[in-house]
Amino acid sequence: MKGTPSFGKMNKGGSHIRCRRCGRNSYNPTKHKCAACGFGKSKRITRYSWKTKKVNGVRLK
């Protein structure tokens, strides 16, 4: 897939699938890395306070 006609095919489906390490729907199969836990990029799970959603006013751990 190369060139201008192929750009029309990029809107089908999502860009992220379920990650097999953290279970969240944030693994990018094109980049081979998870946006949530960093699977495929680092061996350690990346955790940031600004990256987790608040549930009942308390941040997820």
UniProtKB/Swiss-Prot annotation:
InterPro entries: Ribosomal_eL37, Ribosomal_eL37/eL43, Ribosomal_eL37_CS, Ribosomal_zn-bd. This is Large ribosomal subunit protein eL37. GO terms for cellular component: ribonucleoprotein complex; ribosome. It comes from Metallosphaera sedula (strain ATCC 51363 / DSM 5348 / JCM 9185 / NBRC 15509 / TH2). Binds to the 23S rRNA. Its cofactor is Zn(2+). The lineage of its organism: Archaea, Thermoproteota, Thermoprotei, Sulfolobales, Sulfolobaceae. One of its GO terms (molecular function) is rRNA binding. Belongs to the eukaryotic ribosomal protein eL37 family. Pfam families: Ribosomal_L37e (PF01907).
